[in-house]
Structure formats: structure tokens, C-alpha cells
Design a protein with these regions (language model features):
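Short amphipathic beta-strand and strand-loop transition segments with alternating hydrophobic
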Residues: 24-31
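A short, structured beta-strand/loop element
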Residues: 32-54
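A generic structural micro-environment signature
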Residues: 7, 33, 61-64
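Generic alpha-helical secondary structure signal
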Residues: 11, 15, 29, 42, ...
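Mixed-charge, Lys/Arg-enriched low-complexity segments
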Residues: 2, 47-92
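Negatively charged, low-complexity tracts enriched in Asp/Glu with abundant Ser/Thr
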Residues: 1-24
Length: 92
């Protein structure tokens, strides 16, 4: 799997609400020998700790996955809810 960083967003610390963190929005590519299949990976880096989650096999259409990734980035969707948002967007 190839993971390519497309967007990165910095969040500041807000006392009792949010930790300082960096969120990376990435496209994943898997070549199964016949075609390329794309997914989305989001990673959050907080003080030397990194969490990441991936939704694989979203589509073979790069532009569709790229548009979903842009939506997640522009709306600051984080690692907790991005899987549900992707599912909703694919079902529209």
C-alpha cells in the first residue's frame, strides 16, 4: 500500500476542549495487478503520539476518493468520525 499525504492541518490547544495536534489527510493506493484501488488514511499526531485509521477499497476512481478527502479536510473531520462520513457520502 502506498500512502500519499495530500493535506495537513494544525490545531491549537484550547484548554479543556482540544489538545494541540496535527491531522494528516492521506490517499492510499493499492495495485492489485489489474487496477488501482484507492482509500483514505487519516493520522493524528498529538505530543509524540500518533493514531491512524484507514478506510481501504473505497473506489478505483481516484477523483472520487480525492473529492471525499477534500471534503473531510475542508470540514475538519477527524479520525473518530471520518469512516461514518465516508459511508454517508458514498450512499448519496
Amino acid at each position: 500500500m502506498i500512502i500519499k499525504n495530500v493535506y495537513s492541518r494544525e490545531f491549537s490547544k484550547i484548554d479543556n476542549i482540544q489538545k494541540r495536534k496535527t491531522v494528516n489527510y492521506n490517499i492510499c493506493e493499492v495495485n492489485n495487478g489489474i487496477s488501482k484501488i484507492y482509500g483514505i488514511n487519516i493520522s493524528e499526531i498529538t505530543m509524540n503520539k500518533m493514531k491512524e485509521k484507514t478506510v481501504e477499497n473505497i473506489s478505483s476512481n481516484y477523483y472520487k476518493v480525492s473529492n471525499i478527502l477534500q471534503f473531510l479536510y475542508e470540514n475538519s473531520i477527524g479520525i473518530i468520525s471520518f469512516k461514518d462520513i465516508i459511508e454517508d457520502l458514498l450512499n448519496e
